[in-house]
Protein backbone atom coordinates (compact mmCIF):
# COMPACT_ATOMS: atom_id res chain seq x y z
CA UNK A 1 0.00 0.00 0.00
CA UNK A 2 1.01 3.56 -0.69
CA UNK A 3 4.76 4.05 -0.15
CA UNK A 4 5.24 0.32 0.46
CA UNK A 5 3.66 -0.27 -2.94
CA UNK A 6 6.12 2.14 -4.55
CA UNK A 7 8.97 0.18 -2.99
CA UNK A 8 7.50 -3.18 -4.08
CA UNK A 9 6.73 -1.93 -7.59
CA UNK A 10 10.28 -0.68 -8.03
CA UNK A 11 11.67 -3.97 -6.70
CA UNK A 12 9.56 -5.93 -9.20
CA UNK A 13 10.74 -3.71 -12.06
CA UNK A 14 14.38 -3.72 -11.04
CA UNK A 15 14.68 -7.48 -10.67
CA UNK A 16 12.28 -8.51 -13.47
CA UNK A 17 12.69 -12.22 -14.26
CA UNK A 18 14.62 -12.93 -11.06
CA UNK A 19 11.53 -12.14 -8.98
CA UNK A 20 9.72 -15.24 -10.31
CA UNK A 21 11.74 -17.43 -7.92
CA UNK A 22 10.54 -15.41 -4.93
CA UNK A 23 7.03 -14.15 -5.69
CA UNK A 24 4.13 -15.55 -7.71
CA UNK A 25 2.16 -12.29 -7.90
CA UNK A 26 1.63 -8.96 -6.19
CA UNK A 27 -1.08 -6.42 -5.51
CA UNK A 28 -0.44 -2.70 -5.14
CA UNK A 29 -3.02 -0.47 -3.44
CA UNK A 30 -3.10 3.33 -3.71
CA UNK A 31 0.33 3.55 -5.27
CA UNK A 32 1.67 6.84 -6.60
CA UNK A 33 2.97 5.73 -10.00
CA UNK A 34 4.35 9.14 -10.94
CA UNK A 35 5.85 10.95 -7.96
CA UNK A 36 6.12 14.22 -9.88
CA UNK A 37 2.40 14.25 -10.75
CA UNK A 38 1.51 13.08 -7.25
CA UNK A 39 3.45 15.95 -5.73
CA UNK A 40 1.87 18.40 -8.17
CA UNK A 41 -1.57 17.13 -7.09
CA UNK A 42 -0.72 17.54 -3.40
CA UNK A 43 0.33 21.14 -4.01
CA UNK A 44 -3.05 22.17 -5.46
CA UNK A 45 -5.20 24.64 -3.53
CA UNK A 46 -7.70 23.34 -1.00
CA UNK A 47 -7.82 19.96 0.73
CA UNK A 48 -4.82 18.54 -1.11
CA UNK A 49 -2.58 21.36 0.09
CA UNK A 50 -3.94 20.99 3.64
CA UNK A 51 -3.18 17.26 3.52
CA UNK A 52 0.29 18.00 2.16
CA UNK A 53 1.07 20.40 5.01
CA UNK A 54 -0.34 18.00 7.60
CA UNK A 55 1.76 15.09 6.32
CA UNK A 56 4.89 17.26 6.13
CA UNK A 57 4.27 18.24 9.75
CA UNK A 58 3.88 14.57 10.72
CA UNK A 59 7.23 13.79 9.08
CA UNK A 60 8.84 16.70 10.91
CA UNK A 61 7.41 15.55 14.23
CA UNK A 62 8.79 12.04 13.70
CA UNK A 63 12.27 13.52 13.15
CA UNK A 64 11.93 15.83 16.17
CA UNK A 65 11.21 12.80 18.37
CA UNK A 66 14.60 11.32 17.52
CA UNK A 67 16.53 14.47 16.66
CA UNK A 68 19.37 13.60 19.02
CA UNK A 69 20.40 10.99 16.42
CA UNK A 70 20.62 13.66 13.73
CA UNK A 71 22.40 16.46 15.56
CA UNK A 72 25.93 17.28 14.38
CA UNK A 73 25.19 15.56 11.09
CA UNK A 74 24.63 16.40 7.43
CA UNK A 75 21.22 17.97 8.10
CA UNK A 76 20.35 21.52 8.92
CA UNK A 77 17.53 20.46 11.24
CA UNK A 78 16.04 23.92 11.56
CA UNK A 79 15.79 24.06 7.78
CA UNK A 80 14.19 20.59 7.76
CA UNK A 81 11.76 21.63 10.50
CA UNK A 82 10.66 24.67 8.48
CA UNK A 83 9.40 22.44 5.64
CA UNK A 84 5.79 23.21 4.71
CA UNK A 85 5.31 20.48 2.08
CA UNK A 86 6.37 16.90 1.50
CA UNK A 87 8.51 18.05 -1.43
CA UNK A 88 10.37 20.52 0.81
CA UNK A 89 10.86 17.81 3.43
CA UNK A 90 12.15 15.40 0.78
CA UNK A 91 14.52 18.03 -0.61
CA UNK A 92 15.86 18.95 2.83
CA UNK A 93 15.90 15.56 4.56
CA UNK A 94 15.04 12.47 2.50
CA UNK A 95 17.40 13.27 -0.37
CA UNK A 96 20.32 13.80 1.98
CA UNK A 97 19.44 10.65 3.92
CA UNK A 98 19.55 8.46 0.81
CA UNK A 99 22.21 10.24 -1.24
CA UNK A 100 20.10 11.97 -3.87
CA UNK A 101 21.24 15.29 -5.32
CA UNK A 102 17.74 16.78 -5.11
CA UNK A 103 14.05 15.89 -5.07
CA UNK A 104 13.96 15.60 -8.89
CA UNK A 105 16.56 12.84 -8.88
CA UNK A 106 14.80 11.12 -5.96
CA UNK A 107 11.34 11.31 -7.54
CA UNK A 108 12.65 10.13 -10.93
CA UNK A 109 14.16 7.10 -9.23
CA UNK A 110 11.05 6.41 -7.13
CA UNK A 111 8.41 6.58 -9.86
CA UNK A 112 7.08 3.29 -11.22
CA UNK A 113 5.64 4.81 -14.40
CA UNK A 114 8.05 4.04 -17.22
CA UNK A 115 9.16 0.77 -15.60
CA UNK A 116 6.02 -1.37 -15.83
CA UNK A 117 7.30 -3.20 -18.92
CA UNK A 118 10.11 -4.65 -16.77
CA UNK A 119 7.71 -6.38 -14.34
CA UNK A 120 7.48 -10.13 -15.02
CA UNK A 121 4.93 -11.48 -12.53
CA UNK A 122 1.18 -10.83 -12.41
CA UNK A 123 0.43 -7.54 -10.64
CA UNK A 124 -2.95 -5.99 -9.90
CA UNK A 125 -2.99 -2.35 -8.86
CA UNK A 126 -6.04 -0.80 -7.19
CA UNK A 127 -6.25 2.99 -7.36
CA UNK A 128 -8.98 5.58 -6.94
CA UNK A 129 -9.27 8.42 -9.42
CA UNK A 130 -9.74 10.85 -6.51
CA UNK A 131 -6.53 9.79 -4.73
CA UNK A 132 -4.64 13.03 -4.02
CA UNK A 133 -1.30 11.16 -4.19
CA UNK A 134 -2.09 9.50 -7.50
CA UNK A 135 -4.96 11.20 -9.33
CA UNK A 136 -6.64 9.40 -12.20
CA UNK A 137 -4.88 11.39 -14.90
CA UNK A 138 -1.49 10.29 -13.54
CA UNK A 139 -2.14 6.55 -13.81
CA UNK A 140 -0.01 4.76 -16.44
CA UNK A 141 -2.99 3.42 -18.41
CA UNK A 142 -1.28 3.26 -21.82
CA UNK A 143 1.81 1.61 -20.39
CA UNK A 144 -0.37 -0.93 -18.60
CA UNK A 145 -2.22 -1.81 -21.82
CA UNK A 146 1.10 -2.94 -23.33
CA UNK A 147 1.95 -5.22 -20.39
CA UNK A 148 1.06 -8.91 -20.19
CA UNK A 149 1.64 -8.87 -16.43
CA UNK A 150 0.19 -5.62 -15.09
CA UNK A 151 -3.42 -4.47 -14.66
CA UNK A 152 -4.88 -1.42 -12.94
CA UNK A 153 -8.36 -1.50 -11.44
CA UNK A 154 -9.62 2.03 -10.85
CA UNK A 155 -12.59 3.31 -8.94
CA UNK A 156 -14.05 6.79 -9.20
CA UNK A 157 -13.89 7.25 -5.42
CA UNK A 158 -11.81 5.74 -2.66
CA UNK A 159 -9.26 8.42 -1.94
CA UNK A 160 -5.94 7.24 -0.61
CA UNK A 161 -6.31 3.77 0.90
CA UNK A 162 -10.02 4.39 1.51
CA UNK A 163 -12.29 2.18 -0.57
CA UNK A 164 -14.92 2.09 2.19
CA UNK A 165 -18.44 0.90 1.46
CA UNK A 166 -21.81 1.63 2.99
CA UNK A 167 -23.15 4.29 5.32
CA UNK A 168 -21.25 2.91 8.32
CA UNK A 169 -18.22 1.19 6.79
CA UNK A 170 -17.49 -1.37 9.51
CA UNK A 171 -17.31 -4.48 7.32
CA UNK A 172 -14.75 -5.44 4.73
CA UNK A 173 -13.75 -2.62 2.45
CA UNK A 174 -13.77 -2.87 -1.31
CA UNK A 175 -9.99 -3.28 -1.33
CA UNK A 176 -10.27 -6.26 1.06
CA UNK A 177 -12.71 -7.98 -1.27
CA UNK A 178 -10.58 -7.29 -4.35
CA UNK A 179 -7.48 -8.65 -2.60
CA UNK A 180 -9.32 -11.78 -1.47
CA UNK A 181 -10.66 -12.46 -4.97
CA UNK A 182 -7.29 -11.76 -6.59
CA UNK A 183 -5.40 -14.01 -4.16
CA UNK A 184 -7.94 -16.78 -4.65
CA UNK A 185 -7.65 -16.46 -8.41
CA UNK A 186 -3.85 -16.56 -8.34
CA UNK A 187 -3.42 -19.39 -5.86
CA UNK A 188 -6.46 -21.60 -6.35
CA UNK A 189 -5.25 -25.00 -7.44
CA UNK A 190 -1.61 -23.88 -7.36
CA UNK A 191 -0.69 -24.64 -3.74
CA UNK A 192 1.25 -27.75 -4.77
CA UNK A 193 3.78 -25.47 -6.49
CA UNK A 194 4.80 -23.97 -3.14
Regions found by a protein language model. Give the residues of each.
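Active-site nucleophile elbow and catalytic-triad environment of alpha/beta-hydrolase enzymes
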Residues: 92-115
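Conserved loop-alpha-helix segment in the C-terminal half of the alpha/beta-hydrolase fold
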Residues: 129, 133-150
Amino acid sequence: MSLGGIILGNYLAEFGEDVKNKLKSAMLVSVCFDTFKGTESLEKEGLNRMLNRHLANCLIQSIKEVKQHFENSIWDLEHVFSSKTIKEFDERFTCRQFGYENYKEYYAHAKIAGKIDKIRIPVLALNAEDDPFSPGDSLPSEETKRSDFFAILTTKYGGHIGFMEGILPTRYHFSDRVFEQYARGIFQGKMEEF
